[in-house]
Each structure stands twice: as C-alpha cells, then as structure tokens.
C-alpha cells in the first residue's frame, strides 16, 4: 500500500497525492478560505462533482495550463470541452481508471446547473466519487443531502475515508451528516463545505462530538491548507 496525502483546500476542494495527484472540485481563486492560488496546483487529474461555480471553480483554467485529465459527469464534461479544454464524461454507477486511479461515480442529492455569462447551462446530475488511490478507498460525496443508499456505498466500496459536507442550507447539516457516517461506516471522516461563507457557518466540534457518541469513526477536523498523511 502506497502512502496517501490528503490536503484540504477549503470548501469542497481536496488534493489527493500518492504516485499521482488528484484534485477534486478546485474552487480556488474565488474561495475566501483558499490557502493557495490556481497557479500553485499541478494535478495529473481533476475530478468535478457537479457544475456549480463553487465546485467547477478553476477547472478550465488549471486544465488548460497543465493538460491534466478532467473527469466529470457527461454534461459538465461537454461544457468544459465547449471552452476548448478536453474533459472525459462518465455517469453514476460507472468506473473509470485514470493514471492508475479508479474513480467510481456515485449518487448525490443536489442540483448541477452551470451559471456563466448570464446564462444557466445544463450541468446534468450532481454526483460524488469513490476514489481508489494508493491502496485506499476515499469517498467524496460532493454536495448532497443524506440518502439511504449511502449504506450501499459503504457496503460496496468500503471507503476508509469519507469527505462529507456539514454546512446545511445547500447540503447536509450536522444532524444529517452524522447519519451519513452511520450509514457509510468509514474509518475516518473529514467534514467539508462549511464556514466558507456565513450562510454555511457550522461548528465542526459539534459534528465531532455527535459522531463519536454514535460510532467508532474518527473525525479529523482540518484547516484549509492542512494535510493528513495515511
């Protein structure tokens, strides 16, 4: 099993580093909590969970500069390609292997329009990813509410690490995210998508206490720019 380094870049953006570098939802330049600039990032792969601006983020700019491979749901991939940057589409339930990293697209309860240039484009369906990298299974739920088939995700893919939103309003809040942890049963959970803006302000310590009162999952609360090494 190779080493895996996970760095939180604020909001729902993460950099996963093993033999290759995978960047998820690179909302960087407009993210008030971002610890870096898009120019600092040189991923081999970008995975985009859905079309909203705070997730698609700087994907096109980073992709154009680095030539990295971009994976997203079919409609978001088509939008990226319309901007002159190659992207590879997939859909829920499917798995693609890119640079030795397997990405399985999972269900998410959210929306996915792409708002740009005064128009709203079809962004298909929102999604999450189960990522097999460096011998580890990592579940990034994307923006989502809690849903019963999270238990199926846990049974099928057995993610050791879950990256889950707790901000409420647009995603799960703390109560729902705790239930998600119960359903998935990961070894580690990292809360995300909170405190970027006042409208999604939450206390992650409240989440930690609620999780640890119910299950054996370890809660790791990260600061933007902080990394964990597995």
UniProtKB/Swiss-Prot annotation:
One Gene Ontology term of the molecular function aspect: hydrolase activity
UniProt keyword Metal-binding present: no
Signal peptide: none
Family statement drawn from the similarity comment of this UniProt entry: Belongs to the UPF0173 family.
Lineage, opening ranks: Archaea, Methanobacteriati, Methanobacteriota, Stenosarchaea group, Methanomicrobia
Organism in which the protein naturally occurs: Methanosarcina mazei (strain ATCC BAA-159 / DSM 3647 / Goe1 / Go1 / JCM 11833 / OCM 88)
Protein name: UPF0173 metal-dependent hydrolase MM_2300
UniProt keywords, alphabetically: Hydrolase
The keyword Cell wall biogenesis/degradation is annotated on this UniProt entry: no
Superkingdom, taxonomy of origin: Archaea
A Pfam family of this chain: Lactamase_B_3
């Amino acid at each position: 099993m190779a080493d895996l380094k996970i760095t939180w870049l604020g909001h729902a953006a993460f950099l996963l580093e093993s033999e290759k570098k995978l960047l998820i939802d690179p909302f960087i330049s407009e993210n008030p909590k971002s610890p870096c600039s898009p120019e600092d990032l040189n991923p081999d792969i970008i995975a985009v969970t859905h079309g909203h601006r705070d997730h698609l983020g700087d994907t096109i700019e980073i992709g154009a500069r680095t030539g990295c491979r971009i994976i997203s749901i079919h409609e978001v991939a088509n939008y990226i390609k319309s901007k002159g940057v190659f992207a590879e589409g997939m859909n829920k339930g499917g798995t693609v292997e890119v640079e030795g990293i397997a990405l399985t697209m999972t269900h998410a309860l959210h929306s996915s329009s792409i708002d740009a240039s005064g128009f709203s484009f079809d962004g298909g369906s929102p999604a999450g990813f189960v990522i097999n990298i460096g011998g580890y299974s990592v579940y990034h739920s994307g923006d989502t509410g809690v849903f019963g088939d999270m238990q199926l995700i846990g049974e099928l893919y057995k993610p050791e690490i879950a990256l889950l939103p707790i901000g409420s309003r647009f995603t799960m809040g703390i109560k729902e995210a705790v239930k998600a942890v119960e359903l998935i049963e990961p070894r580690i959970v990292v809360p995300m998508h909170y405190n970027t803006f006042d409208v999604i302000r939450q206390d992650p310590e409240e989440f930690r206490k609620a999780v640890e009162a119910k299950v054996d999952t370890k809660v790791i609360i990260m600061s933007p720019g902080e990394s964990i090494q597995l």
